């Protein structure tokens, strides 16, 4: 009987700080004490561990057992420490060998039968263990996540007995990976599925190339949602680093990560009834929200005025900083949240603001649109109207335009040009970088400033128009921003023009 030390990992946001599980067995009144700031679920592990050890045909020591989860000031939650606690008890009671424990880390929840159940946040733990050159033993069901870090680096097990057999040299564990048969079938959707709306498709191309936030405005049934769903198909796959960040966030929710297409950019479309916690993250134990699950991908908000205003306004800071900070009494938790925002809305409560179907006056339309705050609208680089198709378009077959593959090729070439010039896409350029990479001739700058005053736009909008113009120039292979690029960028300010028109009618 003595002391055993087992290495494990906690889960704090997308971080996996190390936790040392110290188990001491001594003579005295039989008891099981757990210290080190454990949550209720961790305290309950005492009963799970005892039953798992007995049902795995080991002896549970009838002595005084003290388990310390260090560091003590780090909050611990969930059943992820069941496996290391059980192994610590077996090692301290000399029922398994201790010589390999230093090179291993363990996470996993134990069933009463000794089976190891899956836990959240395995991927961040696997990355952290890899940095300190330790092998992480994970539950069988989490093997796919650990495999993203490296198949040869980590191991998975189905039961406590399997782990003990590996530590004692009786068998060698490997890393479980699901069958390739789960590979997702490639998408069959295409831009040519959409009849007409060539200006909307052009805006989609510009937004995809420069990663610009885009707002679709128009009556019901004109193709706003359909256009938004095609945006991800124009974007290149994530880099290894981006994909690992996104997968790490996904692993915190126990959503399945398909290792065969895990580099595809995420597309999240929350319902308009979503709460603030669902959208930006929260909870007693902070969990990522939709904006973090859309990290490095696309967040689509349909029927934007139907969202609560405070929920929409909570997006303002993450859109600028690229992260969300959730504060709790125990500390702050940070989640990455750099996403491309695409919104869609009807221009009035009835869906129409002009023509024979319009049934709302300018005052009620303004009241409806005021659910979107000015600072939030300011964060859209582009806003474009998607009108109803002209009469005869459907009967004549309509203009379906270019295929997704043709547009995607131009988008990828433009993005490569941006990355070669500044190391980032145009939407992420800061103020000083705009001055460096997006210079304007004096006459063009005066033209843009004049347009800015006529529309009543802010300095933030000024910078966003320049960045959109820079993207348009990149798509055309131009090194310098010219007047036509600025004019086209100003054309994508439909929301500003609508609000100015309604305000004038309401006077």
Residue ranges and their predicted role:
Residues 1-215, 219-226, 262, 327, ...:
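Peripheral, non-AAA+ core regions of ATP-driven protein-machinery
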Residues 35, 41-46, 61, 68-78, ...:
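Basic, amphipathic alpha-helical bundle interface domains used for macromolecular binding and assembly
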Residues 205, 260-261, 266, 274-299, ...:
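Conserved alpha-helical scaffold flanking the Walker A/P-loop in AAA+ ATPase domains
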Residues 215-259, 321:
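Walker A/P-loop
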Residues 218, 281, 303:
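The Walker A (P-loop) glycine that initiates the GxxxxGKT/S ATP-binding motif of P-loop NTPases
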Residues 242-275, 282-283, 429-433, 439, ...:
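Conserved inter-motif catalytic segment of the P-loop NTP-binding fold
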Residues 296, 302-304, 314:
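Walker B catalytic acidic pair
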């Amino acid at each position: 009987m003595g002391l055993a030390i087992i290495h494990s990992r906690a889960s704090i946001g997308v971080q996996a700080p190390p936790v040392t599980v110290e188990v001491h067995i001594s003579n005295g009144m039989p008891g099981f004490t757990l210290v080190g700031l454990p949550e209720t679920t961790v305290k309950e592990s005492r009963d799970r561990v005892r039953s798992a050890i007995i049902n795995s045909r080991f002896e549970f020591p009838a002595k005084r057992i003290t388990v310390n989860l260090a560091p003590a000031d780090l909050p611990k939650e969930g059943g992820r420490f069941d496996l290391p606690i059980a192994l610590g008890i077996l090692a301290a009671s000399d029922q398994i060998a201790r010589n390999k424990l230093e090179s291993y880390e363990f996470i996993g929840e134990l069933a009463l039968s000794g089976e190891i159940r899956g836990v959240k946040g395995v991927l961040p733990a696997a990355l952290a263990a890899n940095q300190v050159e330790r092998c992480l033993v994970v539950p069988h069901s989490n093997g796919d996540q650990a495999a993203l870090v490296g198949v040869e680096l980590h191991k998975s097990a189905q039961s406590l007995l399997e782990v003990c057999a590996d530590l004692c040299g009786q068998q060698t564990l490997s890393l479980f990976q699901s069958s390739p048969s789960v590979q997702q079938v490639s998408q069959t959707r295409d831009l040519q599925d959409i009849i007409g709306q060539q200006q909307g498709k052009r805006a989609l191309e510009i937004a995809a190339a420069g990663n610009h936030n885009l707002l679709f405005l128009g009556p019901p049934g004109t193709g706003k949602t359909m256009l938004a769903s095609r945006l991800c198909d124009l974007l290149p796959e994530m880099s290894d680093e981006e994909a690992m960040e996104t997968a790490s966030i996904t692993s915190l929710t126990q959503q399945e990560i398909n290792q065969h297409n895990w580099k595809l950019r995420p597309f999240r479309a929350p319902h308009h009834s979503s709460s603030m916690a669902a959208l930006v993250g929260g909870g007693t134990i902070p969990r990522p929200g939709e904006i973090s699950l859309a990290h490095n991908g696309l967040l689509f908000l349909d029927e934007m005025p139907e969202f609560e205003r405070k929920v929409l306004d909570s997006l303002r800071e993450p859109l600028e900083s690229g992260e969300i900070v959730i504060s709790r009494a125990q500390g702050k938790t940070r989640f990455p949240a750099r996403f491309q925002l695409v919104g869609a809305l009807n221009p009035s409560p009835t869906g129409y603001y002009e023509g024979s179907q319009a049934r709302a006056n300018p005052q009620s339309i303004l009241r409806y649109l005021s659910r979107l705050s000015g600072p939030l609208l300011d964060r859209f680089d582009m806003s474009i109207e998607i009108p109803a198709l002209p009469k005869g378009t459907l009967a004549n077959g309509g203009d379906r335009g270019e295929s997704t593959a043709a547009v995607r090729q131009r988008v990828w070439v433009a993005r490569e040009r941006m990355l070669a010039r500044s190391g980032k896409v145009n939407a992420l350029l800061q103020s000083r970088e705009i001055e460096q990479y997006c210079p304007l001739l004096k006459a063009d700058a005066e033209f843009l400033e004049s347009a800015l005053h006529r529309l009543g736009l802010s300095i933030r909008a000024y910078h966003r128009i320049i960045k959109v113009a820079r993207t348009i120039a990149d798509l055309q292979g131009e090194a310098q921003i010219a007047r036509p690029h600025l004019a086209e960028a100003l054309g994508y300010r439909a929301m500003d023009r609508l609000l100015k028109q309604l305000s004038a009618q309401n006077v």
